[in-house]
Amino acid sequence: MRLTVGQVHRHVLALASSRSCFVLGDNLPLRMLSLPRAVRFHQTAWLGTETVQDKSASLTLASLEGQNKVEYGKKEKATRIGGPKPSSRASALKVKPKVSSFNSKPAKSTLPKSAVVKKTLKIDESLFSAKSFEELGLPPLLIDRLNKEGLSTPTEVQSAAIPIISQKHDAVIQSYTGSGKTLAYLLPILSEIGPLKRPTEQDGSDKRSGVEAVIVAPSRELGMQIVREVEKILGPNDKRLVQQLVGGANRSRQEEALKKNKPLIVVGTPGRISEISAGGKLHTHGCRFLVLDEVDQLLSFNYREDMHRILEHVGRKSGTSSRDILGPLARRSERQTILVSATIPFSVIRAARSWGHDPVLVRAMSVVPLDSITVPRPVLSQTDANPNSPSNSVNQAAVNSLPPSLEHYYCISKAQHKVDTLRRCIHALEAQTVIAFMNNTKPLKDVVFKLEARGMKATELHGDLGKLARSTVLKKFKDGEFRVLVTNELSARGLDVPECDLVINLDLPTDSTHYAHRAGRTGRLGRKGTVVTICEETETFVVRKMRKQLAVPIKPCEFTEGKLLVHNEEDVE
């Protein structure tokens, strides 16, 4: 609950009851409280309530937004819940339930209203169709590095996100997998920190040597992929300025690298970042950027404690003036919070409002203030989906997460024949780089054995493999030593294999969001790709349901005589 206490008469008897009293409220059950004696307060108070949370929402870090805060200020008018009007000697005590993101302990400090700084949103829509990075205002040194890497034209989401982040807005970036979201936030960050940043008058006097950007990813694979992207842009001479802090790696070596290299950018998983921070080896109070990649996954309950520490210790929430803040918080740098994912459910919107200041939702060719986002309604058909409607932006989370250049099919097969159907599918489509998804780890080895027995080079990838083994498997698969990678949900997010031309679902994904993330492993950066779901006849209704939710055509097919034969939906039914 959020309390506002007026500073008025002291030593006023507020509650006086010989035995009991009843407490009423929107969020409090009627219960009897035993009061053996009168209780004396320094302020007189009465209660008012206001509901601010959707009780039907799922329990996530985002749905539990905010923290309990006590603000002290002048007398102000409040709405009573009943009873006689309070006397002139009493001050108003407002109670606004606002549940903590992580726990129910009160916040240590309170920001006065004068400390809040409103940011002005300026959107130059002409930049949405930018043909070069020069048009987006990136510094010359950074543009030279991009040209050396063969990157000259920004993608649509990069054209929309780079100017907004450069204006120091907190942002939620949503776009389909493989659209260039990583560079969409890395480039404006590297424009402000590191050797490629734009020159400023403070360059000579800037003594900062600590971490200035923290990027959090839910998996080791995604974290290392981001590290490689940063190293590629910084070049071989400056790649020491980025440090990985992922789980599964040697912690002592990571801490030694932090001390020796003094990196400006840290990329890691929540557990390892929180662990090293708690050990006093990672100092992030001066951090200017906090990026949460695949944020919808970081909201899951198992990251609760680690994300709590990261949000509490990385910089200071933007939108506040250091002149109006007292204590240790005033010495922290103001951070810019950026949330990224291909799918943005409404829980992420709530998290962005709680963790950031005046955040905006950035999508390809679109920038929308989060204040305009309302509770979504279900999308049942393509006609219901309007990508330009702010109120429907969240509904489009899964729809817009699919690359536009994909072909979707489903094939009916008995469970014991699925692997053979997989093999015939690969031959019929002449696919050279294939990722096959299953829901469990145990059957992976059996599928690989059957494919190898039929002369098809295959390997497995799952979380039970060690870090070195996983890295070796991925490298060999990308180098073409294996034609098929059989994996589970581990690889559904963040795995970047540009050459992948076919994704096969040997097991049905659990929902449309998982389907979108699996499908996003192919068709990256505008390339063509194919997604085939192999299901049993009793599972076809699930495919049709996902087809409606995603608003994409998933056509029935079969593989006969080495060819793909597409059926009409009416013929199948």
UniProtKB/Swiss-Prot annotation:
Pfam family, one: Helicase_C
Domain Helicase ATP-binding: 162-362
EC number(s) recorded for this UniProt protein: 3.6.4.13
Annotated Helicase C-terminal domain residues: 421-565
Keywords, ordered alphabetically: ATP-binding, Helicase, Hydrolase, Nucleotide-binding, RNA-binding
Motif DEAD box, residue numbers: 293-296
InterPro entries tied to this protein: DEAD/DEAH_box_helicase_dom, DEAD_box_RNA_helicases, Helicase_ATP-bd, Helicase_C-like, P-loop_NTPase, RNA_helicase_DEAD_Q_motif
MF GO annotations: ATP binding; ATP hydrolysis activity; RNA binding; RNA helicase activity
Chain residues that bind ATP: S175, Y176, T177, G178, S179, G180, K181, T182
Enzymatic reactions: ATP + H2O = ADP + phosphate + H(+)
Location of the motif Q motif: 131-159
Top-level taxon of the source organism: Eukaryota
Family statement: Belongs to the DEAD box helicase family.
PANTHER family with a match to the protein in the record: DEAD-BOX ATP-DEPENDENT RNA HELICASE 47, MITOCHONDRIAL
Domain notes: The Q motif is unique to and characteristic of the DEAD box family of RNA helicases and controls ATP binding and hydrolysis.
Designated name of the protein: DEAD-box ATP-dependent RNA helicase 47B
Organism for this UniProt entry: Oryza sativa subsp. japonica
